[in-house]
């Protein structure tokens, strides 16, 4: 390489070439390996970008916002999934064991994984619910593809046919969408083997409107007669 560079009139000594290759390799080890481990061990990986996470050491306020938003969104989503399965949603979502799988340099990467349930938390017959929850968590990036410029597109019904799970997913994405106030302008969300989604203040506006005024397909009017057995005023 040094000889080829000399023919082109470039001053490239073997030592300078080795130094450059070593620097590139060290940068790859510093940034690539931690991220690769995150992608392999996490159910969901967040990548935040913005002025608050540009430095080598991200702002603590930005990190705290991301970790709190992730926990709140996933616990709320888990409560909806448990509720759909007729389980004690309040108890199980509160006891949900969410693990921080690690962080990686390059703006701010943060990985989250759902730990297996313990025997005292859930019986064996209900363990499939956790797999449904893990699937719902990993599908969050896929759902972002249905967020259009001004509205959530009808394709969301193909991704999430169940209306209740669809609403829960949109609420989770709304909670994850950056406000821009903590130095985070965009948040990429990815999961193993699935497409990466992106959330920003624009998606936040669209999601807020979709959650506030859901687009109900096949609307019908009718009168219902029955007895109200239970009402959850917290939802």
Question: What name fits each language-model region?
Answer:
Residues 32-34, 195, 212-216, 226:
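Short, flexible coil/linker segments at or flanking structured domains
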Residues 1-201:
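Protein-protein interaction interfaces in oligomeric scaffolds
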Residues 201-221:
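Short boundary/loop segments of OB/S1/cold-shock single-stranded nucleic-acid-binding domains
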Residues 181-183, 231-234:
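A short, compositionally biased
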Residues 218-233:
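Structural detector for short beta-strands of small beta-barrel domains
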